[in-house]
Each structure stands twice: as structure tokens, then as C-alpha cells.
């Protein structure tokens, strides 16, 4: 018996990955829906399967923690802590179809301290081999840039270069950042 092939488009749904959202510990973050708010119905927000907002009403459990704007369907989470991280899903109807907007919230500490560690070795030709390490107070999602004079280079935590006596003193700055903050440290005695 011959069965004709079924079109691949039947019953196949593409899932949209969550949008990454970062919040500063102790701060607040607002999550918005992707569609035009005026056209939405049956709006709700959930976090990790727990209902926060349903039919434009905030759950008593979240009254002090969130602010919900029923006009534009934005959810603002206040006084962020590690407990607030998770997957937030806005569900709503538009044109008789259910839609969702999903966020993956990560709460991070601000960078509070940046220190440059220096290791200098004098070489036989009177030049110096310089190793600099940028130490930072927090450890996740960090990015680095270094400034040496007027040059910006390297996205590593550590840099290495050589100096000749004719180079004189130079100034080096490490800029460290994560999605919620940035700090820098300078060393002008290299």
C-alpha cells in the first residue's frame, strides 16, 4: 500500500528561545511583551510555573515584589535577589491565537573591586617583560579590555608585553564589566 508523504509543515512548531535579561542585585528590572499591548487579551505572567499575574490581577504572594502595568502588560520586579532568577513567561491572546514572550532572568552582583597584579622581569638586554593580571571581585559573565597609552586592546584577563628603557613610564588601565556593571583600575608605575 502506498502512503503519500505528509507535508512537513503540519503540526510542527518552532519554539522561540527565551530572551536573556540581566538584573542588578538589589535593583529592579522590567519585562515587556513583544506585541502591541492594545491588541492583547487574557494576559498572564508566570515564573517557573508559578502564576504572578492573571487576568490583570497580581497574585497576593507577589504584591510587594512586582509592579504590573495592565495597559502595556509590562512586569517590573523590584529589589532583585538570587531567588528572582528564572524563566518568566508572558502569555496572551492576539487575533484569537495564543502567544508568549519568554525571558530568562539572571541576577548578578555589581563589580565592586578591580585590582591589577603586576609581574615584571628584567631581561638581559635591559628590557622588561611585563605580565599584568586584572583581578575582579565577581566571577561570572566578565569581559575585559585593556588600555595602554592611547591603545585599546585584548579582551583577556591577563596581558603581556615588553618594555625598553626608552619607553619610560606607561599607564595601563583594565576595564572589567559584566551585564550589570563595570569598573576599572589603572597602574601608571609600569
Residue ranges and their predicted role:
Residues 38-49, 62, 130, 136-150:
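Solvent-exposed loop segments of extracellular immunoglobulin-like
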Residues 1-27, 36-39, 44, 50, ...:
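N-terminal Sec-dependent signal peptide, specifically the hydrophobic helical h-region
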Residues 28-34, 123, 128-138:
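A short beta-strand segment in extracellular, disulfide-stabilized domains
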Residues 51-58, 62, 148-161:
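Surface-exposed, flexible coil segments in extracellular/virion-facing regions
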Residues 12-17, 109-120:
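Proline-enriched interdomain boundary motifs that mark the N-terminal boundary
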Residues 80, 157-171:
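Solvent-exposed segments in extracellular or luminal domains encompassing
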Residues 87-110, 152, 173-190:
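Extracellular/luminal immunoglobulin-like beta-sandwich modules
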Residues 28, 61-109:
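Ligand-binding face of N-terminal immunoglobulin V-set domains in extracellular IgSF glycoproteins
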Amino acid at each position: 500500500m502506498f502512503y503519500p508523504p505528509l507535508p512537513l509543515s503540519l503540526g510542527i512548531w518552532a519554539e522561540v528561545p527565551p530572551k536573556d535579561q540581566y538584573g542588578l542585585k538589589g535593583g529592579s528590572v522590567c519585562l515587556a511583551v513583544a506585541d502591541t499591548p492594545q491588541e492583547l487579551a487574557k494576559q498572564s505572567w508566570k515564573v517557573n510555573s508559578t502564576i504572578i499575574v492573571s487576568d490583570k490581577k497580581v497574585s497576593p504572594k507577589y504584591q510587594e515584589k512586582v509592579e504590573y502595568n495592565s495597559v502595556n502588560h509590562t512586569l517590573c520586579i523590584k529589589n532583585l535577589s538570587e531567588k528572582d532568577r528564572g524563566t518568566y513567561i508572558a502569555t496572551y491572546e492576539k487575533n484569537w491565537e495564543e502567544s508568549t514572550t519568554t525571558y530568562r532572568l539572571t541576577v548578578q552582583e555589581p563589580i565592586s573591586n578591580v585590582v591589577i597584579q603586576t609581574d615584571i622581569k628584567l631581561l638581559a638586554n635591559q628590557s622588561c617583560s611585563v605580565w599584568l593580571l586584572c583581578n575582579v571581585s565577581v566571577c561570572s559573565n566578565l569581559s575585559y579590555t585593556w588600555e595602554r597609552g592611547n591603545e585599546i586592546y585584548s579582551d583577556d584577563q591577563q596581558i603581556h608585553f615588553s618594555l625598553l628603557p626608552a619607553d619610560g613610564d606607561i599607564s595601563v588601565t583594565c576595564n572589567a564589566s559584566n551585564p550589570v556593571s563595570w569598573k576599572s583600575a589603572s597602574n601608571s608605575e609600569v
